[in-house]
Amino acid sequence: MKYLSILLALLFVVACEPTVDNPDTPTPPNTEDDGKDDSWMDEIIDTSGADYLFKDGITGKVMFLEYNGLSNDYISLFDNATGLTLFLDLYSPMVYDYVTPGIYTFGDGAAMTAHRDYCYIHFPDDTLMRFTDGRVKVIVDPEHSSGYPYYHITARFVNDAEEVIAADYEGQLIAQ
């Protein structure tokens, strides 16, 4: 009995021992981390009540370019039902071979900005809708079981007419 209680005590100590966090282990995409590591992940981009919402039946594509030493990722989200295409032009430091995770604010092509001149909606009749303000949040699992990066992209834009354009896309981006 004495040996059994010692064995159980050792088993309890080993079972309760904290695991060592491996910084090389990728964090799967999620919409929040409860303030544990990357605070930007806790920021919510509200897509509710949008006049135009890119969510279901969307095909996502990306073109990877380089501009002034920055990664210039040009994303298109095509709505198969309406024929609308949302273009996102994101700039980030050249770190990964996929779209850099983070929050992109409206800007002019500096690091971690969504370029205000090249983020817009293209309508089937070839007209464009430009935005006056916006934000994009990108979460990525670069080691998804499919073998390709898996993205969760949320975005919210406003145009001159105060219409809200939003995106909540989950899936892979086909490289062009």
Where are these regions (language model features)?
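Sec-dependent bacterial lipoprotein signal peptides
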Residues: M1-V14
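Bacterial Sec-dependent N-terminal signal peptides
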Residues: V13-S48
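Primarily marks secretory-pathway-exposed extracellular/lumenal segments that are disulfide-
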Residues: V20-P28, F106, V140-P142, I174-A175
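N-terminal helix-cap/turn-to-beta initiation motif at the start of protein domains
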Residues: T27-D33, V136-Y150
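Edge beta-strand at a domain terminus
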Residues: G35, S39-W40, H152-Q176
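Surface-exposed helix/loop patches within compact recognition domains
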Residues: Y52-S145
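Residues at beta-strand starts and edge strands
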Residues: L84, G134, G147-Y151, E163-A167
